[in-house]
Each structure stands twice: as structure tokens, then as C-alpha cells.
A protein has these predicted regions:
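Charged, often glycine-rich, active-site loop that binds/positions anionic groups
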Residues: 88, 113-130, 228-236
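Signature of alpha-helical transmembrane segments and their immediate interfacial
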Residues: 1-37
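Acidic-histidine catalytic/liganding microenvironments
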Residues: 13, 97-100, 209
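Short amphipathic beta-strand/extended segments in non-transmembrane regions
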Residues: 71-73, 88-112
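Solvent-exposed, non-transmembrane loop/terminal regulatory segments of multi-pass membrane proteins
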Residues: 34-78, 84, 130-133, 137-153
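Hydrophobic C-terminal alpha-helix "anchor/cap" residues
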Residues: 10, 94-95, 206
């Protein structure tokens, strides 16, 4: 039956079928302008996921900043003068980016057990690993043995350090209740473009510091941007493949 339909309808009316296909193609092409890709922190989690609900609760209660995470494994020891200077240089370079709010590294952690002074004095005038008048070995061991910082800003073996890059809050839409859907979507698209540009900028910085050790980039903004890039690329490749096949 399918063969008869193909022979009697399609093969005998090639022009009509071609016109119908072209109309369908142009119709789908016209409405494709309304196709949107979304990859935000919430879309990366399943709706109803307990982790997502917990994230919403914490965000509503305390507020939050988006952030990126870097891992830094220096070529030399973590507390060698070269590694510390390189980490400081990397921090200041990232912090100079206009979309970065702050950068937290191993060198910003207060050392409270690095001297024998009274606790109150140590709290008021705490030292960090970047200070020259401290025992770096003792300070590093304090951080490494801390249940608060171990596996958070420093790996258990002491070879890899974490870097937190806090991103400035996005400017909210003013009078959102008076905005049209198109204006809101345009604002979202602008934020996505800014996020993509931010990821490109920090990757350029990381690339320029590749000689000091191994540096990796992570964080939800990066994952979201990479997902968007990969999906767009796959859509183009798949679309061209189907077009060539047809």
C-alpha cells in the first residue's frame, strides 16, 4: 500500500510535492526565529530536584553571586616564592577584568596559628601566606590540616589550590512588570552574550599563564556557556547534514 501511494501520488506529482515541501520548509524556517536555547543554573538541574529547591531557599534567604572556579597546580611547590608570586599575578590579572567582583585564593586565608601571640591579637592582625614575615611551611600546614579549608581551597595532597572568582551581579531589568516579552527576551540574550564574552576573556588569561602550571576552569556559568556553544554547533552540523542528505 505504501509503495502504491508513493508511485501514484508522489512520483506522478513531483511539482506539487516539491511545492508542498518548499512551503513546509519556509514555514518552519520562519518560525525558527522563535526557537530559544536556555542553559542557566536552574535548567542544568531537574525541576523538583531537592538540590535545586535547597539552592532556591538559600538564594532567597541570603542572596548569592555567580562565581567561577579555577584549580591551580603549580610547576613547583605550592608555597615556593615562584608559585606564590605566580598565583598573586594570576589573581590580580583576573581581578582587573571589569566583570569580576573579587578573587579568593589560598593566599587570602587568615592564619591564626602562625604565631604564639594572644588569640585576640591574632584575630585583629592576622597574617596570610603572601606576607613576608610568616613561617610559610607552618601556615601551609595549618591550612592543609583545617577541616574548613582542606578539599575546598587546597587539595588533600597539597598540590592543587582552588581559586574562587566572584562575578558582579547583573543589572536587573527596571520596571519589569511594564516590559514586553520581547524586551525581557532581549535582556536575557544580552546577559548570555556578556557571559560568553566573560568566559572567553578569562580563558585568554588562563592561556597566558599556562607556563606557570596546570590551570583548569569550572563553574556553572562556564558549563552553561559551553552547553550553549556545543548545542548550537550540533544544530548547525546536523542541519547541514540533513540538507545535504535531502
Amino acid at each position: 500500500m505504501i509503495t502504491q501511494f508513493y508511485q501514484n501520488i508522489i512520483l506522478k506529482n513531483p511539482k506539487s510535492i516539491l511545492i508542498i515541501l518548499l512551503i513546509a520548509l519556509f514555514t518552519f524556517g520562519y518560525y525558527s526565529k522563535d526557537f530559544k536555547l536556555d542553559a542557566s543554573s536552574e535548567t542544568l538541574l531537574i525541576e523538583g530536584d531537592p538540590d535545586l529547591e535547597y539552592l532556591k531557599e538559600i538564594t532567597n534567604r541570603y542572596g548569592s553571586k555567580e562565581f567561577l572556579i579555577l584549580t591551580y597546580t603549580p610547576n613547583e611547590g605550592m608555597i615556593s616564592d615562584v608559585s606564590i608570586n605566580n598565583l598573586l599575578s594570576l589573581k590580580y590579572k583576573i581581578q582587573s577584568l571589569n566583570w569580576v567582583h573579587s578573587v579568593i585564593t589560598l593566599l587570602d586565608i587568615p592564619l591564626l596559628n602562625n604565631s604564639d601571640a594572644p588569640l585576640q591579637e591574632r584575630l585583629e592582625n592576622f597574617k596570610t601566606l603572601k606576607d613576608e614575615d610568616i613561617d610559610k611551611e607552618r601556615g601551609f600546614n595549618e591550612i592543609l590540616s583545617s577541616p574548613v579549608f582542606r578539599n575546598f581551597v587546597i587539595s588533600e595532597d597539597g598540590k592543587t589550590s582552588g581559586i574562587i572568582v566572584n562575578i558582579k551581579n547583573k543589572k536587573p531589568i527596571e520596571n519589569i512588570s511594564n516590559k514586553t516579552k520581547e524586551e525581557i527576551e532581549a535582556h536575557k540574550d544580552l546577559i548570555k552574550k556578556q557571559n560568553h564574552q566573560n568566559i572567553l576573556e578569562i580563558r585568554d588569561v588562563i592561556k597566558s599563564y599556562n607556563n606557570i602550571g596546570k590551570i583548569n576552569l569550572g563553574g556553572i556559568p562556564m558549563i552553561a556557556d559551553d552547553m550553549m556553544t556545543f548545542i548550537k554547533s550540533d544544530i548547525v552540523v546536523f542541519g547541514l547534514g540533513v540538507l545535504l542528505f535531502i
